[in-house]
UniProtKB/Swiss-Prot annotation:
Key words of the record: Heme, Iron, Metal-binding, Oxygen transport, Transport
Protein name: Giant hemoglobin AI chain
GO molecular function: heme binding; metal ion binding; oxygen binding; oxygen carrier activity
Family: Belongs to the globin family.
Domain Globin: 2-41
Domain of life: Eukaryota
Keyword Metal-binding: yes
Quaternary state and interactors: Giant hemoglobin is composed of four heme-containing chains (AI to AIV), and two linker chains (AV and AVI).
């Protein structure tokens, strides 16, 4: 779907918040890949 400029900024800000640095970044990345492999092993 198409996103407006405000939606793009909001998503970018949310990703920056979640995928910032350190342990939170590692935990988030690991959770994403576990979900990917669970859906398509």
């Amino acid at each position: 779907t198409d996103c407006g400029m405000l939606q793009r900024i909001k998503v970018k800000q949310q990703w920056a918040s979640v995928y910032s640095s350190g342990i939170a970044r590692e935990d988030f990345g690991e959770a994403i890949w576990k979900a990917v492999f669970a859906l398509a092993p």
